[in-house]
Regions:
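Low-complexity intrinsically disordered segments
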Residues: 27, 31, 36-67
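N-terminal acidic leader/helix
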Residues: 1-25
Length: 67
């Protein structure tokens, strides 16, 4: 799975060390977005969709440092 620079930065900010934990944190973050923060909502939705397609083993290979 290919992630662009913005996606990787978002993932590093919210990384908990697990794929499902990261998805959960991104969903929580979305709850606090203002209606005009559409770019961040779209970015996080795209990351979540890509993360859903990864296995836990593939996620572990991304080498994202946990928060």
């Amino acid at each position: 799975m290919n992630f662009d620079h913005e996606e990787l930065m978002l993932m590093m900010l919210y990384n908990t060390g697990t794929r499902l934990g990261l998805i959960h944190e991104l969903r929580l973050m979305q709850c606090y977005l203002m209606p005009d923060e559409t770019a961040l909502r779209e970015l996080s939705e795209g990351v979540i969709e890509k993360l859903k397609l990864l296995t836990d083993a593939e996620f572990a290979e991304l080498e994202l440092p946990p928060d």
